[in-house]
């Protein structure tokens, strides 16, 4: 069978485009919150970055585990075991509920850790307020992630898109009202941004449940018979999902520590990084939608035993991702100063922030296509169950980067641009390693795939 098929390309685009819109909507939600906060001052922007990343660090292990439901559901769907798809959701809900005591302990510890990171005292209090607000809604985030992964796994990505887009229309006006205290509501500042996010997440869960409990869906996927522990599915969930969870946690830990070390340069440097990562997010997060589309189709074809179609999915994913990121990188390069000025703040430091962020945007345009390769190759490998290799490789590269950052920032006290380019080189290196694994093909050996499908 030919390596590239227009039919497969269209199928991938059909599945992925709603997920691109969905994840793009999340990027818009975060982007708008930070734009609102930029109207206050640059400290609020830096604090939202620090508090938001710290929250994701705390839930990253459980998010990584729960969202592997996507690949599991896709594999069962490809094998024709529709009744097992809904059982994956139940196991995911159980995992989410069991995670709550751990999240409470981790959240308390992380909240106290802000006092010892060397940040400005004003920034610390804002980071803690935003972090604690988001952590109160962490259970909602896990349940929402499970339901979104399920609908992506069965190929109904339009449900995910509709839900997330509608959630934006709750989040953005609510955050504006609560941040600035409009129409008689209290002026909550950064806490208002957090409450807007939590409320929108709870609203999204309600929408997902409307689709999940609809009569036709209940009948096709035997939802009424899915409530209960299924030891075989749960074991497979944990066996394949735990490496993804460890990878997610460790990589988030290294990124979080890198971010916190970088912010020790000062408020100007922290705000410059926050601005650059806001634009990075608008390019990277929609690409996660394509990553999910690739993972879903690879999982489906692994379940169906059709590896020839899997090859076409990989080729199609690379064409779409490199075309998208290449175009966006060119625009970011040409208009980088104008993009930075979107986040102009009224304080006197913005000139310094703009100068540093302009140079950092060059690094962003350099690594955007590496991100595309990482996401497509990683999605294919995860969909085929090669999660242990990804865990060891990705974790090792990220921790090597962090060790290098420790020497650059703490020991040698080199400038922020040296630290930034170390980060860029790490991403480019990881892209080469992922591509080598994918195209060498050990992950597709029949005996390996047979083990992946075992319960």
Question: Locations of the language-model features?
Answer:
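Small-residue-rich hydrophobic transmembrane alpha-helices
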Residues: 45-104, 108, 141-155, 159-160, ...
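N-terminal transmembrane alpha-helices
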Residues: 3-35, 39-40, 56-72, 97-104, ...
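Helix-terminus/linker motif at the lipid-water interface of multi-pass membrane proteins
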Residues: 24, 28-46, 114-121, 177-188, ...
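Short alpha-helical transmembrane segments in multi-pass integral membrane proteins
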Residues: 1-19, 73-139, 185-242, 298-366, ...
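Short runs within selected transmembrane alpha-helices of multi-pass transporters and secretion channels
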Residues: 66, 70, 134-152, 160-168, ...
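Interfacial/gating helices of multi-pass transporter permease domains
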Residues: 37-56, 122-129, 190-191, 232-240, ...
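Transmembrane helical elements of multi-pass membrane transporters/channels
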Residues: 14-33, 133, 153, 167, ...
């Amino acid at each position: 069978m030919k390596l590239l098929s227009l039919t497969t390309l269209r199928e991938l685009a059909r599945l992925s485009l709603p997920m691109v819109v969905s994840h793009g909507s999340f990027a818009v939600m975060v982007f708008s919150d930070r734009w609102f906060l930029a109207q206050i001052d640059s400290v609020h922007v830096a604090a939202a970055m620090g508090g938001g990343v710290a929250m994701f660090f705390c839930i990253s292990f459980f998010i990584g585990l729960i969202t592997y439901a996507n690949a599991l559901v896709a594999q069962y769907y490809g094998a024709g075991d529709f009744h097992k798809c809904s059982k994956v959701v139940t196991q995911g809900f159980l995992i989410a509920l069991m995670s709550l005591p751990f999240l409470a302990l981790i959240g308390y510890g992380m909240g106290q850790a802000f006092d010892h990171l060397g940040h400005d005292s004003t920034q610390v209090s804002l980071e803690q307020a935003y972090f604690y607000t988001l952590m109160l809604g962490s259970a909602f985030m896990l349940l929402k992630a499970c339901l979104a992964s399920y609908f992506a796994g069965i190929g109904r990505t339009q449900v995910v898109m509709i839900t997330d887009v509608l959630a934006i229309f709750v989040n953005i006006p609510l955050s504006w009202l609560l941040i600035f205290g409009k129409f008689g509501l209290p002026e909550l500042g950064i806490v208002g941004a957090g409450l807007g996010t939590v409320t929108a997440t709870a609203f999204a869960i309600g929408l997902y449940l409307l689709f999940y409990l609809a009569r036709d869906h209940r009948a096709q996927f035997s939802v009424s018979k899915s409530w209960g522990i299924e030891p075989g599915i749960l074991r497979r969930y944990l066996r394949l999902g735990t490496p993804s969870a460890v990878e997610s946690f460790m990589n988030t830990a290294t990124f979080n520590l890198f971010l916190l070390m970088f912010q020790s340069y000062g408020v100007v440097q922290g705000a410059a990084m926050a601005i650059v990562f806001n634009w990075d997010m608008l390019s990277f997060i929609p690409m996660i939608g394509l990553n999910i589309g690739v993972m879903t189709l690879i999982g489906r074809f692994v379940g169906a035993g059709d590896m020839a179609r899997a090859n076409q999915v990989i080729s199609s994913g690379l064409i779409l991702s490199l075309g998208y990121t290449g175009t966006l990188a060119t625009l970011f390069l040409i208009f980088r100063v104008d993009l930075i000025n979107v986040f102009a703040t009224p304080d006197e430091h913005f000139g310094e922030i703009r100068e540093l962020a302009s140079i950092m945007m060059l690094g962003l345009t350099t690594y955007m296509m590496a991100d595309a390769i990482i996401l497509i190759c990683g999605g294919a490998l995860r969909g085929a169950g090669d999660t242990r290799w990804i865990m060891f490789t990705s974790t090792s590269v990220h921790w090597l980067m962090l060790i290098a950052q420790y020497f650059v920032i703490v020991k040698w006290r080199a400038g922020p641009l040296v630290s930034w380019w170390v980060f860029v080189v790490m991403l480019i290196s990881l892209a080469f390693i992922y591509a080598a694994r994918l195209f060498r093909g050990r992950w597709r050996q029949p005996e390996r795939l047979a083990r992946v499908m075992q319960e």
